[in-house]
Structure formats: C-alpha cells, structure tokens
Amino acid sequence: MNEKVRQLVEELFTDPRYLLRGEADRFGDKRLAFSEVCPLLSATGEPIGQLLLSREYRRRGRPDGERPHGQESLLDFYHDQLFQGRLPALAREDAAALREESWLYYIRRNFFFQLGEYDNARQDAEHNLGLLDLLQGYAADEADKWSMARWWPWIERDRAIAAALAALEQEDLLTTASELYRAEKSIREFGEQHAEDYAREDAEKLVTTMVSHVARVAELLREEENLPEAPEERLERAVDAVDAEEIERLRREMERELSGEG
C-alpha cells in the first residue's frame, strides 16, 4: 500500500493514550502488547507527569480475555439471550458494561489499523455497531441509548475505512470506492437526523470530522491508487439529472462491474 496512505491511517487511528509496542507470545497465545498512558496529578489537580502501564490484549475474542457469562463477549451473551427469547430491558448497569466492552474493542481496532490488519479492524468495528444496536433496541433508559448512538459516525467511519482498505489490498477498487462513498453519505445523513441532539451537547464537530476523514481517505486514494468514482455516485448523479437513458446505461454497467464481468 502507498506510503502516504499508511501515514494517513497512522494519523487517524493512533490514540496517544494507548501506545502499541508489538506482539507478545504467551505459550503460543499471541497478544498485542501496549502501554497505557495515565496522567499523574498533584493534590490540586495539576498534571505533574505520566505513568506507563504495561498491558496486553488477546487478538481474538474479547480483548481482555474475559468470558462474561461463559460467552466470548457480552454481545455474544445477549445475542444468545435474544435467540432464547429471554432478553429483558437492559438496566443502566448493563448499559455501562456494554460501553466498557465497546472501549476494549475500540482500542484493539486502532492497533489492528496500525498493524495493517484491516479485516480484523473491520470486525472489531462491527462488534461495536452490534453493541450500539443492542442498546438501541433494549436499553430501558433513553440516555443509555444515545450514550452509544452518538458515536455511530465514529464507528461507521472506522468500519468503512477498514472495509475499503481491505478491499484495496485485494485490488477491488470498486468496493473500496463504494464503501467510502456510502459511509460519507450515511454519516452526513445521520448528523442531519440528530442535529438537535448534537447541538445540545455542542458536539456537531464530531459528525463533520468523521465525514472529512472519510473524504480525505477517498481523495488520497484517488490521487495515489487511481480510485474510480463509486458506482452509486454515478447513478445518483444520473437520477438527479433525470436522464433515463443514462440511468439505464449506468445500471447495466454497475451490474457488470459488481458481478466481475468485463
């Protein structure tokens, strides 16, 4: 992959609070070794230094290695409860536990981005989207629903960029273009739908920042990797122009491209 693309990924997916050191091998169990940066404060609350805590995350399953209720993750546990028809409304402590799990997967997916393991990063982003959906459907408190939903633009940015870069590695430029175009559009629409919620928190910048990040990746890939225009974008432009002949031509072209035909 182009070095400029790697540099942008490093910029977007490095959290200075969690510094990846490399891999550790524990009797054949490879883990991600990192340092957590913890600020040291004086009695008056002034920063006086930093403490580096050595941590390790498992590469598979829940990053901290815990198995809540004997399942691979809380998401797996609640999905099992749903399957059995036994999931009650999620109390505030349940929602807090789900948010804590989402934080573990957020940290690890950043590491996967830094390592160039884009499909693993995508899977961890999808895990957190699953947690978000769970809270949206079953949290008893509306505040708990929004506490995760507000981060949807961030998680979708990560999922889409990871999926796009994984497709790029397979030289599937159309999928790369489609992932980025759809994400940029859907994040912008989400921000419009929830404009009042973000305004109450003075957090409108979250949405615009995530949109700009996806756009930056797409622009760089167009410059460095000859990324084509997304089929959906071409079709929407034809629809806006009310050009029936062009719409039909593009529809047939999209079908050929997405089916892999010449």
Where are these regions (language model features)?
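N-terminal alpha-helical interaction modules that lie
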Residues: M1-Q136, E171-F190
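Alpha-helical solenoid repeat scaffolds
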Residues: Y78, L104-I107, F111-Q114, D144, ...
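TPR-adjacent "capping" and linker segments in tetratricopeptide-repeat scaffold/adaptor proteins
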Residues: Q81, G85-S102, D144-E156, R216-P228
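Amphipathic alpha-helical repeat scaffolds of TPR domains
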Residues: A97-Q114, E126-L129, D133, R150-E169, ...
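Hydrophobic side-chain positions on well-ordered alpha-helices
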Residues: F112, A166-A167, R234, A238-A241
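Short, charge-rich amphipathic alpha-helical segments embedded
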Residues: Y118, R122-A149, A183-E201, R249-G262
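Solenoid-repeat scaffolds in large eukaryotic assemblies
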Residues: A121, N128, L173-E179, E229-P231, ...
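N-terminal cationic and glycine-rich segments that engage phosphates or anionic surfaces
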Residues: Y181, L206-A230, E236, D240-D243
